[in-house]
């Protein structure tokens, strides 16, 4: 029994008495506590008190203390054991024979007799110890006083009959009957026996319920700590097992597919040979064995590919020429894509019929476009583009594929500068030129406009398969990236090094940070959600979702920090279900009534009360989280919705569809988009969903494309204001960590790379 527990409980009792107004009771309680006979159940202090009574020859208080201990504690130990025995016999009387029961009772009776005998012997020895101490100190009068006071009681004990002569023996130390009691050995043995007995009694006495509550609370905390430690050990072992299973699976795939290209089978477009590389700062999205090449990749996460991007002026071209590797066909080239126009007010949907693009994925490509002006641009794969801004006729000769391109400048299209990654035409100072037609408005460039420029870019090549998702932690200190091989990597942005690899054993389709507790949620295509604590760098556990809907298509964390939503669909993508989960218990809270809708993308509003969803049937549905039912919905796209995102003002909503449309909506005037953005289209095959990412003040947003770049938009301008290039495959995921001081963009592609791009901001004061 811990004295600190008693003191803590005493303070609680005093606090309760004062709270109830029992001031007099509290006063007496304090007085009795000062005269505590038990000394807080501290054996040393009780023995010290016994020695004080003996040394002061206070036999009355000595006997009183012993009787108090006997009645209060010693007898209760006996009573408790008796009850335990009786209960045990009652519960087992149908199974024990009479012989066994009698044997158990005999054993108990013997133990009980031993306890009573021990108590009686210690009581007698304590009094003998008092008498011997008095004789050793020549206090014969105290000895006679003792026998006079307790003679009637002692005469009943045969062991004491010879002790009545002790005060009259001249030299009792040499008397054979009493010699042993005057030895130091007997005195020390008695003191040790008494100490051990009291310690055993105090450890086994039944505690009051009020004290048991506090002890149980402490015991529960101790057990919880043990459970946490065991869970941590279990997760470490599971992580090791997952890693070994992943390596085994990789080795099996490696042995069976040495001559196959995973990139060709997954992306559906022609890949150049490994030897055909540009001698520039980017790597081609090439074929080769994914698993073999992963062993050759460096462990270091990011490598600097450019220190500074200087914007340069460029000529106009159509959207098909925006890629820096035009000779290779792009995913989705077979369908029409909206061209990016500088003036969407006049030419949002106008496509010049004089411009044609013919692509052959098996042979070299020759593209001819008639132009009305004259300019010459010679492009070589080993050098940067040379642009003559005084002429208006461009002729591009590529030594790798022999592509010749003539571009018109009267179709309203603007070429994206691949060297500086700056959209539209710019002057010698790096600012965008004003529109030649002099139009002002949402798409015009006005004085004082914020301009983004790419300052630097780093590339990560540690993933061995196509990227599926990448996302910043809210404070920008960490990056999570996932790939189709089932691995998730956590990166420390400040140190630019790979920190942790999480093995999920199947393709990771969704990724989400819970920013308050720094948890990472990874949804896979085999009915699992892995939850990882980035602070402790350990797994919390796995959530098993419905086997009927194995693909966890999207995860969205509620801004209130209490829950998250998951959208799971079946393998045929014909049915799905949406659940909300309690983040603390990891149990389902609500099943949203989606009326059979298959949901690809989800987004909470800033208060966490509404959930917007983008569906396979092209509709946007908005759910009320409290009721779990849709409160609004409209047909937004003619094909699947791949991304839907709430703005922080809770009035605007952005959506991206497989139909190549990128819209801004007002949820109070549904049915007609507020703005349509010039967008080249997103990846069609294989199926991917994505996220639209905003800067800190929601004035700009970023989105990936089926080309080899991501596009940055001002929310009030239809045309993109910046292109984030460098990838050699479609950009399927991106995220933007923005603050008033810095802007960092991360993009992930089917080329297996992650690119970290730092932006600089300036204002156009022309």
From Swiss-Prot:
| Gene Ontology BP terms | early endosome to late endosome transport; negative regulation of phosphatidylinositol 3-kinase/protein kinase B signal transduction
WD repeats by residue range: 462-501, 503-542, 547-591, 594-633, 636-675, 684-723, 726-766
Family annotation (CDD domains): bZIP
User: Compositional bias of type Polar residues: which residue ranges?
Assistant: 269-304
Output the Gene3D superfamilies linked to this UniProt entry: YVTN repeat-like/Quinoprotein amine dehydrogenase
Span list, region Disordered: 88-108, 249-415
Taxonomically, the superkingdom here is Eukaryota
Regions of biased composition (Low complexity) lie at 253-268, 339-412
Q: Where in the cell is it found?
A: Early endosome membrane; Late endosome membrane
The molecular function terms in GO held by this entry are: phosphatidylinositol 3-kinase inhibitor activity; phosphatidylinositol 3-kinase regulator activity
What InterPro entries is this protein classified in?
A: Apc4-like_WD40_dom, ARMC9_CTLH-like_dom, WD40/YVTN_repeat-like_dom_sf, WD40_repeat_CS, WD40_repeat_dom_sf, WD40_rpt, WDR91
UniProtKB keywords: Endosome, Membrane, Repeat, WD repeat
The GO cellular component terms are: cytosol; early endosome membrane; endosome membrane; late endosome membrane
Note the topology in the membrane: Peripheral membrane protein
* Pfam families in the cross-refs: ANAPC4_WD40 (PF12894), CTLH_Armc9 (PF23138), WD40 (PF00400)
Q: Which family does it belong to?
A: Belongs to the WD repeat WDR91 family.
The record's function comment reads: Functions as a negative regulator of the PI3 kinase/PI3K activity associated with endosomal membranes. By modifying the phosphatidylinositol 3-phosphate/PtdInsP3 content of endosomal membranes may regulate endosome fusion, recycling, sorting and early to late endosome transport.
Q: Which PANTHER family match?
A: WD REPEAT-CONTAINING PROTEIN 91
**Protein name per Swiss-Prot or TrEMBL:** WD repeat-containing protein 91 homolog
Annotated gene:
wdr91
């Amino acid at each position: 029994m811990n004295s600190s527990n008693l003191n803590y409980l005493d303070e609680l009792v005093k606090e309760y008495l004062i709270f109830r107004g029992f001031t007099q009771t509290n006063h007496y309680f304090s007085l009795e506590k000062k005269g505590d006979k038990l000394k807080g159940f501290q054996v040393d202090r009780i023995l010290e008190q016994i020695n004080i009574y003996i040394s002061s020859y206070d036999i009355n208080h000595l006997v009183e203390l012993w009787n108090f201990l006997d009645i209060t504690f010693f007898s209760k130990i006996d009573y408790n054991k008796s009850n335990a025995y009786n209960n045990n016999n009652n519960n087992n009387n149908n199974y024990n024979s009479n012989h066994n029961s009698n044997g158990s009772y005999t054993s108990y009776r013997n133990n009980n007799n031993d306890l009573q005998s021990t108590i009686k012997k210690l009581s007698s020895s304590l009094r003998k110890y008092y008498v011997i101490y008095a004789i050793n100190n020549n206090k014969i009068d105290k000895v006679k006083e003792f026998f006079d006071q307790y003679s009637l009681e002692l005469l009943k004990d045969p062991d004491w009959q010879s002790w009545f002569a002790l005060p009259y023996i001249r030299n009792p130390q040499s008397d054979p009957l009493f010699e042993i009691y005057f030895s130091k050995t007997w005195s020390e043995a008695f003191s040790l026996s008494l100490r051990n007995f009291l310690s055993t009694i105090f450890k086994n006495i039944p505690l009051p319920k009020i004290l048991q509550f506090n002890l149980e609370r402490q015991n529960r905390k101790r057990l919880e700590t043990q459970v946490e430690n065991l869970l941590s050990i279990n997760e470490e072992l599971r992580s090791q097992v997952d890693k070994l299973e992943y390596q085994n699976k990789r080795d099996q795939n490696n042995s069976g597919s040495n001559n196959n290209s995973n990139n060709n089978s997954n992306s559906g477009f022609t890949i150049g040979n490994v030897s055909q590389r540009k001698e520039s700062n980017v790597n081609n999205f090439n074929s080769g064995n994914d698993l073999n090449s992963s062993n050759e990749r460096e462990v270091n996460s990011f490598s600097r590919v450019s220190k500074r991007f200087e914007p340069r002026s460029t000529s106009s071209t159509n959207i098909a020429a925006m890629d820096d590797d035009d000779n290779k066909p792009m995913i989705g080239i077979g369908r029409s894509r909206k061209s990016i126009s500088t003036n969407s007010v006049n030419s949002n949907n106008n496509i010049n019929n004089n411009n044609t693009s013919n692509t052959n994925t098996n042979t070299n490509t020759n593209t001819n476009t008639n132009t009305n002006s004259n300019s010459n641009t010679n492009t070589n794969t080993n050098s940067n583009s040379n642009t003559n801004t005084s002429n208006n006729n461009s002729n591009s000769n590529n030594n790798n594929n022999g592509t010749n391109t003539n571009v018109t400048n009267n179709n309203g299209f603007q070429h994206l500068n691949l060297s500086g990654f700056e959209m539209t035409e710019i002057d010698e100072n790096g600012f965008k030129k004003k529109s030649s037609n002099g139009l002002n408005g949402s798409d015009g460039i006005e004085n004082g406009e914020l301009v983004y420029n790419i300052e630097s870019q780093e590339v990560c090549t540690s993933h061995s398969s196509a990227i599926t998702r990448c996302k910043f932690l809210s404070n920008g200190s960490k990056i999570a990236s996932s790939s189709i091989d089932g691995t998730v990597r956590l990166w420390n942005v400040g140190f630019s090094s790979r920190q942790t690899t999480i093995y999920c054993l199947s393709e990771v389709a969704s990724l989400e940070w819970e920013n308050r507790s720094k948890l990472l949620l990874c949804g896979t295509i085999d009915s699992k959600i892995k939850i990882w604590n980035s602070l402790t760098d350990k797994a919390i556990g796995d959530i098993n979702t419905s086997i009927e809907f194995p693909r966890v298509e999207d995860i969205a964390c509620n801004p209130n920090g209490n829950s998250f939503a998951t959208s799971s669909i079946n393998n045929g993508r014909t049915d799905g279900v949406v659940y909300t989960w309690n983040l603390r218990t990891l149990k389902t809270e609500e099943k949203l009534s989606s009326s059979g809708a298959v949901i690809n993308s989800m987004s909470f509003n800033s208060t966490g009360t509404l959930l917007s969803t983008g569906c396979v049937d092209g509709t946007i549905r908005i759910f009320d989280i409290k009721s779990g039912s849709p409160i609004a919905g409209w047909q937004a796209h003619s094909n699947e919705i791949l991304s839907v995102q709430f703005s922080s003002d809770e009035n605007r909503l952005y959506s991206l569809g497989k139909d190549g449309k990128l819209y801004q909506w007002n949820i109070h005037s549904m049915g007609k988009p507020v703005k349509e953005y010039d967008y080249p289209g997103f990846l069609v095959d294989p199926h991917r969903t994505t996220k639209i990412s905003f800067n800190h003040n929601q004035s700009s947003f970023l989105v990936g494309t089926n080309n080899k770049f991501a596009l940055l938009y001002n929310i009030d301008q239809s045309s993109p204001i910046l292109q984030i290039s460098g990838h050699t495959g479609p950009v399927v995921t991106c995220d933007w960590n923005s603050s008033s001081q810095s802007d960092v963009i991360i993009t992930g592609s089917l080329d297996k790379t992650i690119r970290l791009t730092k932006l600089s901001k300036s204002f156009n004061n022309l």
